[in-house]
Amino acid sequence: MNIHEYQAKEILSKYNVPIQPGIAILKYEDIDYAIDSLATDTFVIKAQIHAGGRKIGGGIKISNDKNEAKNLAKNMWGMNLVTPQTGPKGQKVQRIYIESAAKIKLELYLGAVIDRSNHCITFMASSEGGINIEEVAHTNPDKIIKVKINILTGIQPFHSRKIIFQLGLTGDLAKQMAKIMSAVYSMLINTDATQVEINPLIITLDDKLIALDAKINFDDSALFRQPLIQEMRDEDEEDQLELRATKADLSYVRMNGNIGCMVNGAGLAMATMDIIKLYGAEPANFLDVGGSADKERVAEALKIISSDQNVKGILINIFGGIMRCDIIAEGVLAAAKEINLSIPLVVRLAGTNFELGKEILSNSKLQIVAANDLDDAARKIVEAVS
């Protein structure tokens, strides 16, 4: 789960990470009051969306005039903000953060992630903080400092010293960085965060470290024990089909292709997407109905896939182990009739009750194409949408 910048800063502030004074605006009519309430000479107006690169897209503005700041915020509200991370479709701005400007001497980068590959928490830092950190990581990876932390021992002084030394921080700045790293580590553990980024972490003209921008991602599977974090969820920022799938307990990720996929099992789903690409087409989604789906869940999965306007055909690939193929067939028929499915549908069933499942589908009056194996299924659906 993602949250907005102002929410991330609220959490970091509770762990004593320094931030600039700011006010979140959640209603258009609160813009004037918020700007009047912020005691600063220079206003920074920030669009709040779940994507980076806002400055490039015009989502961050600076003004020394209160009235101009109000107009900038009002013009920003409701705009469709397109950044390198939103894609061409962009994201509608429905929240704004007004912040006091800081006097910057240097921009650093500091991040921490759950590093599954190395079974640890990895801190990353760089002296090249700012909007182009991704480019720095790609073109000059030596500029990214990495420190791996064993979760059994936790963060130790020597972990902080490695980053502090390589960043060239000394004196009070070194002490500030050590405190911030310790705070970020504690916050990541306590809130079930999977990623924390402070970019930039600035050094001000009076040598203070301040988190000028922040991004935090959380483990969806741990939200049941993080009610305060769950309250921060902004469903307007999420893909509505993915949100609908989450509520139906379905693993669904939307993609850019035109062939929808319904599969049981993540490995089989990956193989299905691979073979679609092998035949020259692109999958429109990853959808795993799981191993114990019932008729209603299968029907909802098909409705979600068919709700994507980019989908021109659907491939259902089921291997029945715990799941019975006749249950899949009944769910498919129920959904197809309800939504009056008009696009090509290819179904490959194997495993428990697969013959009964095929019989149910063949006895229906719907235009459903049966496939003998995965290769046959992929070929048929690609031909059908070509």
Curated annotation (Swiss-Prot):
PROSITE patterns, sorted: SUCCINYL_COA_LIG_3 (PS01217)
Binding-site residues, ATP: 46, 99, 102, 107
Residues that, per the record, bind substrate: 264, 321-323
Listed GO CC annotations: cytosol; succinate-CoA ligase complex
Gene3D superfamilies on file: ATP-grasp fold, A domain, ATP-grasp fold, B domain, Succinyl-CoA synthetase domains
Keywords recorded for this protein, A-Z: ATP-binding, Ligase, Magnesium, Metal-binding, Nucleotide-binding, Tricarboxylic acid cycle
Cofactor note: Binds 1 Mg(2+) ion per subunit.
Pathways per UniProt: Carbohydrate metabolism; tricarboxylic acid cycle; succinate from succinyl-CoA (ligase route): step 1/1
EC number: 6.2.1.5
UniProt-listed GO biological process terms: succinyl-CoA metabolic process; tricarboxylic acid cycle
Top EC class, one word: ligase
Residues binding Mg(2+): 199, 213
Catalytic activity line of the entry: succinate + ATP + CoA = succinyl-CoA + ADP + phosphate; GTP + succinate + CoA = succinyl-CoA + GDP + phosphate
UniProt GO MF annotations: ATP binding; magnesium ion binding; succinate-CoA ligase (ADP-forming) activity; succinate-CoA ligase (GDP-forming) activity
Cofactor(s) essential for the protein: Mg(2+)
Pfam annotation, one family: Ligase_CoA
Alphabetical list of InterPro entries matching this protein: ATP-grasp_succ-CoA_synth-type, ATP_grasp_subdomain_1, Succ-CoA_synthase_bsu_CS, SUCC_ACL_C, Succ_CoA_ligase-like_bsu, Succinyl-CoA_synth-like
Family (UniProt): Belongs to the succinate/malate CoA ligase beta subunit family.
Cross-referenced PANTHER family: SUCCINATE--COA LIGASE [GDP-FORMING] SUBUNIT BETA, MITOCHONDRIAL, SUCCINYL-COA SYNTHETASE BETA CHAIN
SUBUNIT field: Heterotetramer of two alpha and two beta subunits.
Role summary: Succinyl-CoA synthetase functions in the citric acid cycle (TCA), coupling the hydrolysis of succinyl-CoA to the synthesis of either ATP or GTP and thus represents the only step of substrate-level phosphorylation in the TCA. The beta subunit provides nucleotide specificity of the enzyme and binds the substrate succinate, while the binding sites for coenzyme A and phosphate are found in the alpha subunit.
Protein name: Succinate--CoA ligase [ADP-forming] subunit beta
Gene from which this protein is expressed: sucC
